[in-house]
Amino acid sequence: MEGFLRFLVAKAILLALASSFVSCYDPSPLQDFCVAVDDASGVFVNGKFCKDPKYVKAEDFFTSGLNIAGNTINRVGSNVTNVNVDKIPGLNTLGVSLVRIDFAPGGQNPPHTHPRATEILVVVEGTLLVGFVTSNQDNNRLFSKVLYPGDVFVFPIGMIHFQVNVGRTNAVAFAGLGSQNPGTITIADAVFGSKPSIMPEILAKAFQLDVNVVKYLEARFSSNYDRHY
């Protein structure tokens, strides 16, 4: 029961905090709602067509399952469960989404960015080392902190950031993002697993690596195995 109450409190806090992001990046809505629908006869707004309001139901604003732990048996030892406009059509134009992140001991949400959203994260279970790196203009400074249950950390929009479980038990965090569809670019996957591949000579010079090391990394990532989202 205590764990369930912590889950409810964390979810309520995130929704309250994330609501402040609604107008920070996505365009503000000009109607009560615009429930997304795959219908070419609908009205095109913010990347999604709008369902006719008279056909909107409560289910358009609902999803379930965030109480269920994600499968962390993968190469990075973590799992991200997304609740965005693809899961809740009613999020369309509302500028907010939510994720649950599960970590095995030693697992990580590897360095990545959200090009369209600021992220605010709260730890529910376990111990996480989190951080983000600033832009070139700020000399790529690292801001990092160890978080415990109840701790909250913000990752500014577009900054490369990460989370790592530094505890001996599983860890769980929830994060609110200031976009209905924040997008995710995992740095290693994008650089070494792009389709088609970036020329190894380019990456070898950029990362100051032997070209054969780059070819090895590209072979590992381009296989598209166990991609992390």
Swiss-Prot record:
Q: Which CDD domains match?
A: cupin_OxOx
Q: Where does Mn(2+) bind?
A: 112, 114, 119, 161
Record's keyword terms, sorted:
Apoplast, Disulfide bond, Glycoprotein, Manganese, Metal-binding, Secreted, Signal
Compartments annotated for it: namely: Secreted, Extracellular space, Apoplast
Give the source's domain of life in one word: Eukaryota
> What Pfam families has UniProt attached to this entry?
Cupin_1 (PF00190)
Concerning PROSITE patterns, the annotation shows: GERMIN
- Intrachain S-S bonds: 34-50
Gene Ontology CC entries for this record: apoplast
Q: Where in this chain does the record put each Cupin type-1 domain?
A: 64-215
Q: Which positions make up the signal peptide?
A: 1-24
A Gene Ontology molecular function term for this protein is:
manganese ion binding
Q: SMART domains, per this entry? A: Cupin_1
Q: Which residues are glycosylated?
A: 79
Task: Check the record and name the PANTHER family matching this protein.
Answer: GERMIN-LIKE PROTEIN SUBFAMILY 3 MEMBER 3
Subunit field text = Oligomer (believed to be a pentamer but probably hexamer).
Tell me the function of this protein.
Answer: May play a role in plant defense. Probably has no oxalate oxidase activity even if the active site is conserved.
The family line of this record is:
Belongs to the germin family.
Q: What is this protein called?
A: Germin-like protein subfamily 1 member 7
Biological source species = Arabidopsis thaliana (Mouse-ear cress)
Taxonomic path: Eukaryota, Viridiplantae, Streptophyta, Embryophyta, Tracheophyta
